[in-house]
């Protein structure tokens, strides 16, 4: 037998053993505990998104909501095509680039360095009244979320407008789940493949 044939037979035997060994190993799967943890993480995310601070700019209709009770915004304010309000009644007409000083009182319009706005008319991302499953699916749907993948959505969570939910100014309830816990839950859910309940 030539040396080349011998080497080929040894290599073939080695590959066969390797394939047989690999076939006996348990496949790597996301077990129920991983999925359960991801779904628990999403529930934390859901609680934040369905808090009034987030829902008020993510209603089902075109009128933003306001207040801790989520009532329809006064002055017949409307979303507008770009989410910044209608001509002559744009969000920034009343909402400045920062929360006003507390001495101004409890009912002064809040502000954000990013500029106040809602999602655009053709990319409504609705948080109000959505079931956990529907909310989860919609968040990941680029037709509704501004064309963002999970990494871009995570970046969005660091914008001044989103951060505002944890420091909404005098007379407004902040998001009840600490921001660090929310971000950790988002990241755990995303790492697990963002499963939906």
Region annotations inferred by a language model:
Residues 3-40, 52-55, 60-65, 184-197:
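Post-cleavage N-terminal segment of exported redox proteins
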Residues 28-48, 64, 68-83:
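Electrostatic cytochrome c docking/interface patches
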Residues 43, 52, 105-197:
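C-type cytochrome heme-c attachment and multiheme electron-transfer modules
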Residues 48, 85-88, 130:
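Processing junctions and N-termini across compartments
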Residues 52-61, 88-99:
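The canonical Cys-X-X-Cys-His
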Residues 58, 71-75, 81, 95, ...:
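Histidine-centered active-site/metal-ligand motif
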Residues 59, 66-70, 103-107:
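Short, solvent-exposed loop/turn and secondary-structure capping segments
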Residues 98-101, 115:
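A short acidic, glycine/proline-enriched capping/turn motif at secondary-structure boundaries
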């Amino acid at each position: 037998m030539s040396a080349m044939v011998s080497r080929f037979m040894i290599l073939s035997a080695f590959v066969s053993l390797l394939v047989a060994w690999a076939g006996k190993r348990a496949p790597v799967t996301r077990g129920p505990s991983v999925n359960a943890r991801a779904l628990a993480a999403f529930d934390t995310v859901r609680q934040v998104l369905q808090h009034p601070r987030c829902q008020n700019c993510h209603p089902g209709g075109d009128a933003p909501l306001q207040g801790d009770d989520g009532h329809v915004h006064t002055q017949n304010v409307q979303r507008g095509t770009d989410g910044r309000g209608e001509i002559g009644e744009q969000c920034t007409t009343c909402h400045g680039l920062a929360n006003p000083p507390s001495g101004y009182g409890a009912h002064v319009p809040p502000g954000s360095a990013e500029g106040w706005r809602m999602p655009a008319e053709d990319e409504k991302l609705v948080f109000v009244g959505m079931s956990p499953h529907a909310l989860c699916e919609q968040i990941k749907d680029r037709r509704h979320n501004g064309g963002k993948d999970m990494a871009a959505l995570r970046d969005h969570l660091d914008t001044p407008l989103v951060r505002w939910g944890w420091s909404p100014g005098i007379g407004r309830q902040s998001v009840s789940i600490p921001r660090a816990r929310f971000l950790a839950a988002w990241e755990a859910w995303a790492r697990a493949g963002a499963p939906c309940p």
